[in-house]
Amino acid sequence: MKILLVAGGWSSERAVSLSGAVQIEKALTSLGHEVVPYDLSHDFPGFVRRAKACDFVFLSLHGAPGEDGLPQALLDAAGVPYQGSGPAGSFLALNKAASKQLFLEACLPTPRWTFVPRDAGTSARPDFPLPWFVKPNLGGSSIHMTLVRRAEELPAALEKVFAHGDDALIEEGLSGPELTCAVLGDEALPPILIRPKAGEFFDYASKYEPDAADEICPAPVEPAVTEELSRLSLAAHRVLGLCGYSRADFILAPEGLRLLEVNTLPGMTPTSLLPRAAATAGLSFADLIARLIELGLAQQAKRP
């Protein structure tokens, strides 16, 4: 097939997107596809023209645009197949406040949170105790995220988010091991235990610098925890209306597992978690890419 490989864009996660695209292009080429690289810009008519000239679009995008559902909406309107979730599910997963509300309604355990619009100023105070994680509501890769241990640190943490044009989410800072569990098709992949070698949480450096974190797959946890990780990941995938694949992040708090967020376009760099989980399940990187294309084509066949 002739495949448009879309990467770059203008989000704060552009570098991650481009890094993943290098690996994806190699895999697509090894599978015998003709690859047309495309750096997404605001030229949406140009994007649609390029997409229509291809048989399939592979999205290597993170943040907005990409995980916000914008390219997916344009591709749906053009009738061009792509991998992963559609516009609505993509946006709901990217929007942390919206997705956490859906988790709450579905009785999926998630840390307490407070949403702070960027025009509300920096005087907000959550009604749950310290520590707090302050995050961009629409961001990813832990970019611009701050761990707040003292209340007087909160205004600066909020301003850090607001300065980049996003609303903020203040989340309960639970302690415990970090875990992630991916969904591929209608099955959960083996979960991964994450141990950052430096820092207090799985930040940008831990995620993308080589050997910055120990990522153990399958996670060395009790069978009941593995079963619950699979159940919650599949449930979150369904609640958000996702398809194809996703990856859910968790904290194993003293009270039990807590669902943090779901990624609809998980990282595909050499250090990324989804390829590691797929490898443990017996799928090479090229196998994973082929499966995502297969799922994308099947999903396109279901669209009206």
Curated annotation (Swiss-Prot):
GO biological process: cell wall organization; peptidoglycan biosynthetic process; regulation of cell shape
Entry binding sites for Mg(2+) 1: 249, 261
Name of protein: D-alanine--D-alanine ligase
Signal peptide range in chain numbering: none
InterPro entries hit by this protein: ATP-grasp, ATP_grasp_subdomain_1, D-Ala_lig_Van_CS, D_ala_D_ala, Dala_Dala_lig_C, PreATP-grasp_dom_sf
Documented EC number(s): 6.3.2.4
Record bears the keyword Membrane: no
Cofactor(s) required, per the database record: Mg(2+); Mn(2+)
UniProt: ATP binding residues: 126-180
Keyword annotations of the record: ATP-binding, Cell shape, Cell wall biogenesis/degradation, Cytoplasm, Ligase, Magnesium, Manganese, Metal-binding, Nucleotide-binding, Peptidoglycan synthesis
Family per record: Belongs to the D-alanine--D-alanine ligase family.
Cofactor: binding comment: Binds 2 magnesium or manganese ions per subunit.
ATP-grasp domain residues: 100-294
Subcellular location: Cytoplasm
Entry GO terms, CC: cytoplasm
GO MF annotations, alphabetized: ATP binding; D-alanine-D-alanine ligase activity; metal ion binding
Annotated PROSITE patterns: ATP_GRASP, DALA_DALA_LIGASE_2
Function statement: Cell wall formation.
UniProt pathway: Cell wall biogenesis; peptidoglycan biosynthesis
Entry keyword annotation includes Magnesium: yes
UniProt binding sites for Mg(2+) 2: 261, 263
Catalytic activities: 2 D-alanine + ATP = D-alanyl-D-alanine + ADP + phosphate + H(+)
